[in-house]
């Protein structure tokens, strides 16, 4: 019920927004620039949720600071303009906040606040924690601990919503209920196996988990 849940914290990529096409496009622009193999959207989906260094090692077996610098300078803006919110993202955030539930983002993106701002979601967020704010990436619970602490709620009063096994493992490690979303690369079975408390196929289902209609 709503009085048992005081905060709902979200992953960003493939949870609040579909970034897969934008990342796919920009990753292949980078590949062409540096003579790397082009990758499929399926490969991109497999990497979403990882820090960018690990994503690129998955894509190309390597990571170079030169690539990252070029990507940030030339393609990060292009990527952000290609990201699209899922259809019910804003409505769900409004419903949760209207019921007095705090909302936030915890992401393995560096400077997650920038992409949240670019999607005009900042007014809906009480806290945003990106990779630059912590020492350890998810599934280490550090970022989720930080968000819960900033929100001033207990772990048992918080929920973390995400689309990957990493997100669910993070929730388990933080002793927070994890809601898995099948909008990314994982199905219901995979998310449940990773520790999901509940699994949803659309964000519109999330408020109902807390008694909101």
What name fits each language-model region?
Residues 159-198:
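Acidic, Mg2+-coordinating phosphoryl-transfer loop and its flanking beta/alpha structural elements
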